Amino acid sequence: MKMPEFNGPAKGADRRLMGAGVPAFLLVAFCLGYALSHREEQTLTIGVFAGSNWNVPQGETYAVIDAAVQKFSAQHPGTRVVFESGIKREDYGEWLAEQYLQGTEPDVFSLLEEDFNLYASMGALMDLSDAMDGDTDFNTDNYYPAALRCGVYDEKSFALPVENNVTLMFVNKTLLSRENIGMPAGDWTWQDFLDVCRKVTKDTDGDGVLDQFGCYDYSWEQAAVSNGARLFREDGQACYFADGRMEETIRFMMELQALNRGMRPSARDFDTGRVAFRPFTFAQYRAYKPYPWRIKKYSSFEWDCATMPVGPHGDNVSVCQTLLLGMSARTQKQNMAWDFMKLLCYDREIQRLILQKSQALPSRRDVVLSAEAAEIFHWDAEESAVTPPNLDATMLNAVMPYRFPQYRAAMLYADAEITKIIDGVTPRMNALNKLQKEINAVLQR
């Protein structure tokens, strides 16, 4: 029996099936591609402000951020990094607070030093401890201890240090040279400082009025830090103004002030070259030392910077000011956010760029001690006091600023009372004991 032949669908039916199948296939492929592309494309939002954090001119406002974004995007294809430009530093705190209240804060954002404790205490920041401990490409030993500690709250890490600033001592080299005095040594002491100030403080025109001075704007707090004095307990529940190191600080400041015979040097005296020393931040040094800013500021005399003079029980210590970077506790992109934080705060290339494009110090110690840093600081071939080893020592010795809620109020009161002691308005005998009791009573309420 002959089997029936099967020749498939009719010719017209074949065309109809093919005609229907091709568009269906293309539609499925298009939908699949669209879904995959949109699933892979992600946006990371960051919060930054324009300009310097240190109140000095900065030409290339977003140079470091732009470089970090470009490198991050290359490492994370399909990812967009977005930030709102043009926010001034003085407006940034309010802007960030508004974003947080609206629930639209960035995934990653800069934290002003004065705001860190607030955001950490209210649970707005992601605890980074696990990410830091679990990342084999991340080692906290590469950071300066004080900078890293600035991002710690309640013994947990909530932020990474981006860049730092420390206080140095501005030295009027022209004035010292005129008095046959050399630049201070790297380990100079209070006594060295006092001796130079005594020698240069004088009436140069013979009218009976002092017109040249040793120092301007040097505070008892800066002296206390360099003498190893600890003013407060870290949690702000106690103060230590009656400590022997503070007694030494007050005596030193009284002796220093007595050189001026009741006169107070002014900013104009300093600007016109009639003052030998003034505390000066590293950011100010970086901004005003090289051309062209040195022509616009302090151009009438040669100057440099040295470390802060050391007290009998201290070291050449400065308070470390740090710009921090935190992660929102509400972000849904924790891994991506951590990668960006690590890139900006830890990547050697980006940290080197902080030296090149900003007025701040990187947070990585090996970058400060690098050959590139030596080239950047080599402005004065004769005798620059600001060298990588000196800055490294300053950062290693640096201490954290106090950040407990009542700090500003306590310091305002302490400053007023200590100024009275130094000025001789309040007798020094037992004054610090009394001050300690008064401030402790307020702190422990």
Language model features by range: what are they?
Residues 154-162, 167, 191-239, 275-277:
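Extracytoplasmic/periplasmic solute-binding protein
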Residues 87, 113-166, 300-307:
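Hinge/lid segment of periplasmic solute-binding proteins
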Residues 107-110, 276-281, 286-288:
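Paired acidic/hydrophobic, glycine-rich loop segments that form the ligand-binding mouth/hinge
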Residues 355-420:
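Long, aromatic- and glycine/proline-rich binding clefts that accommodate carbohydrate-like moieties
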